[in-house]
A protein has these predicted regions:
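Short loop-beta-helix segment that forms the pyridoxal 5′-phosphate
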Residues: 1-3
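Conserved small/polar residues in nucleotide/adenosyl-binding loops
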Residues: 188-195
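Active-site phosphate-binding strand-loop segment of PLP-dependent enzymes
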Residues: 47-108
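Amphipathic alpha-helix from the class-I
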Residues: 173-186
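Short, structured coil segments at secondary-structure junctions
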Residues: 32-33, 95, 122-123
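Conserved PLP-anchoring active-site segment centered on the Schiff-base-forming lysine
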Residues: 8-25
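Active-site PLP attachment segment
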Residues: 118-157, 163-174
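General beta-strand structural signal in soluble alpha/beta enzymes
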Residues: 17-18, 38-39, 72-73, 99-103, ...
Length: 199
């Protein structure tokens, strides 16, 4: 997440994001000096949980802060709530902004049909996917996915600033094994989970 934010933002840049972001996003803002423009998601009064950002809230933030360089979305939130990601990506791009996604709890979106759209399928520019949370890889391992609007060489440069240059082959191999395990069986497993959830 830090590398994603540091790739998109420089000192003084504004970034639009929900108030319920992970602290790693806030740490990235401290490191790069970017200025947060918070969108306050509504709270479901019955469940007492924060919801996702509404299209109208994002549109208002973009209109009020046209010089922002990026919009960051939780996809999904910690509680599994998804925003209208396709619409938010389009709004960001129409305004000349990048769209970044924290997919800490959205690993499964890449491996099964009938699920909410993954950030990259929605056209986001970057997504941080925490395979270790719901994909089965070792703790601390995650994927940083990039789209065509982001220069991969620059991303590598930022990663080298924030992380060790001696990557853990144990962590990297656990990512690959988890991806391999999820791909062929994902549809069957996700349908079984969906069936259980609907009981």
């Amino acid at each position: 997440v830090q590398s994603m934010v540091l790739t998109a933002c420089k000192r003084g840049d504004e970034i639009i994001l929900p108030r319920n972001v992970h602290r790693s996003v806030l740490n990235a803002l401290v490191l790069c000096g970017a200025v947060p423009v918070y969108v306050n998601p509504e709270v479901d009064k019955r469940l007492g949980i924060s919801l996702g950002m509404k299209r109208e809230q994002v549109a208002k933030a973009i209109k009020e802060h046209p010089n922002a360089v990026a919009v960051l979305v939780n996809n999904p939130t910690y509680y599994g709530i998804c925003s209208d990601l396709r619409a938010i990506v389009k709004m960001a791009h129409d305004a000349g902004m990048l769209c970044l996604a924290d997919e800490a709890h959205g690993t499964h979106f890449y491996f099964g049909g009938g699920l909410p759209v993954s950030a990259m399928a929605a056209g986001a520019d970057m997504a941080s996917v925490s395979m270790h949370k719901s994909g089965g890889s070792l703790t601390q391992s995650s994927l940083l996915l990039t789209g065509p609007n982001v220069h991969a060489g620059y991303v590598r440069q930022i990663i080298n600033l924030t992380q060790t240059t001696s990557g853990s082959y144990l962590l990297m191999s656990s990512l690959d094994i988890s991806r391999r395990n999820l791909a062929p069986v994902s549809y069957t497993h996700l349908r079984a989970h969906e069936t259980l959830a609907n009981l």
